[in-house]
UniProtKB/Swiss-Prot annotation:
GO BP terms: amino acid catabolic process; carbohydrate catabolic process
Function: Catalyzes the dehydration of D-mannonate. Has no detectable activity with a panel of 70 other acid sugars (in vitro).
Name of the protein in question: D-mannonate dehydratase Caul1835
Residues the record lists as binding Mg(2+): D211, E237, E263
Active site, renumbered: Y160, H213
Co-factor note (free text): Binds 1 Mg(2+) ion per subunit.
Site (Important for activity and substrate specificity): A315
SMART domains: MR_MLE
Keyword annotations: Carbohydrate metabolism, Lyase, Magnesium, Metal-binding
Kinase in keyword set: no
SUPFAM superfamilies listed in its UniProt record: Enolase C-terminal domain-like (SSF51604), Enolase N-terminal domain-like (SSF54826)
Length: 403
């Protein structure tokens, strides 16, 4: 059996910071995993280096579930984004190793393909509704069947999801957190008009999505969901802060707009009530934040019992390693819904060469063995770590608000 002989962490910043774990075995086979936690990368590096890697050496690389349980239960201070990102990186790397030894693309070890490809959604944004829709039309012309719409809000200087670049968005943009002002009322007056204009310009064949980014109260979210109903959005994402799962019950009482949440969740316990009571339609837990493929499969299986589909987070704070892992997962589960997809920069793709491809609105992980992605450490070394914080938001009276 292949024994783990070495493991190391590589940190690189080809436009944004990524944390990669590389595990080597006695067979000469290695695997890679993503441990990136946007804006808080170095704590995960420390956790891996000081606490996880020493415990891996000498272990059987095939015993993925046992190693997962060892790292989760053995820590005692379990869960949380740092711990679960570290476990996720180990898990991805071990699945990569197992599939390479088997000579198969990972999705074949996960039960084989349930579909021919993975429907993804792109991000269209702009300072105005008109600019957002112009960019959405570009995505539609590229073959996307689903597009997330985010637009500037009149009277607010900066808004979540609206970037300087039309197609690349990195919110962690400052050596210290940048601040923006927020007005819920201005936003609620503006958002329905975005979707009305979108249906007029783009038609009804496209799936349209929207991210509220945890900024509303339950009753405000119910109001927005109700206002959006005539335009049939695919989902309303992260309508309220995710900590209070009971909030979604109130939203459900006021709207039939589908609800999605979960990118900040770290385990099945974070979403158990939401899924069990069918308070959401899509669970957005992601492979790098929720403990890797092993644990994400358990979340998906539980969700499948309650008719909840997956819609995994897939912004550029996931490296191509995590994106590849997500695609193998997506391809293999019965209750897949949709996958977020933001293209990486050319520099990032050079650091992380990968086999997955986009065609006609869908991604496919490819048939290379393992995850089908690697890290070019020579290229990675050209881009040293650069401290970057996520922004913060304040209300117009100066008080803090959820970003």
């Amino acid at each position: 059996m292949p024994k783990i002989t070495a493991a190391r962490v590589v940190v690189t910043c080809p436009g944004r910071n990524f944390v990669t774990l590389k595990i080597e075995t006695s067979d000469g086979v290695y695997g890679v995993g993503d441990a990136t936690l946007n804006g808080r990368e170095l704590p995960v590096v420390s956790y891996l280096t000081d606490h996880v890697i020493p415990c891996l050496i000498g272990r059987d690389a095939h015993r993925i579930e046992d190693i997962w349980q060892y790292l989760y239960k053995g820590a005692y201070w379990r869960r949380g984004p740092v711990t679960m990102a570290a476990i996720a990186a180990v898990d991805m790397a071990l699945w990569d190793i197992k599939a390479k030894i088997a000579g198969l693309p990972l999705y074949q070890l996960l039960g084989g393909a349930c579909r021919e490809g993975i429907m993804v959604y792109g991000h269209a944004n702009g300072a105005t509704i008109e600019e957002t829709l112009e960019n959405a039309a570009v995505y539609a012309a590229q073959g996307y069947k689903a597009i997330r719409l985010q637009s500037g809000v009149p009277g607010l200087k900066g808004v979540y999801g609206v970037s300087k670049d039309k197609f690349f968005y990195e919110p962690a943009d400052g050596d210290l957190p940048t601040e923006s002002l927020w007005s819920t009322e201005k936003y609620l007056r503006s958002a329905p008009g975005l979707f009305e204009a979108a249906r007029d310009k783009l038609g009804w064949d496209l799936h349209l999505l929207h991210d509220v980014h945890h900024r509303l109260t339950p009753i405000e979210a119910g109001r927005l969901g109700k206002d959006l109903e005539p335009y049939r959005p695919f989902w309303m994402e992260d309508a309220v802060p995710a900590e209070n799962q009971a909030s979604f019950r109130l939203i459900r009482q006021h709207t039939t707009t589908p609800l999605a949440v979960g990118e900040v969740f770290n385990s099945i316990w974070d979403c158990k009530q939401l899924i069990e009571e069918q308070l959401i339609d899509y669970i957005r837990a992601t492979v790098v934040h929720a403990g890797g493929i092993t644990h994400l499969r358990k979340i998906a299986s539980f969700a499948d019992l309650h008719h909840v589909r997956t819609g995994c987070h897939g912004a550029t704070d996931l490296s191509p390693i995590a994106m590849a892992a997500a695609l193998h997962f997506d391809l293999s589960i019965p209750n897949f819904g949709i996958q977020e997809y933001m293209r990486h920069t050319e520099a990032t793709d050079t650091v992380f060469p990968h086999a997955y491809t986009f065609n006609d609105g869908m991604l496919h992980p490819g048939d290379a063995v393992g995850l089908g992605v690697d890290i070019n450490e020579t290229e990675a070394a050209k881009y040293p770590y650069k401290r970057a914080y996520l922004p913060i938001a304040r209300r117009e009276d100066g008080s803090m608000h959820d970003w």
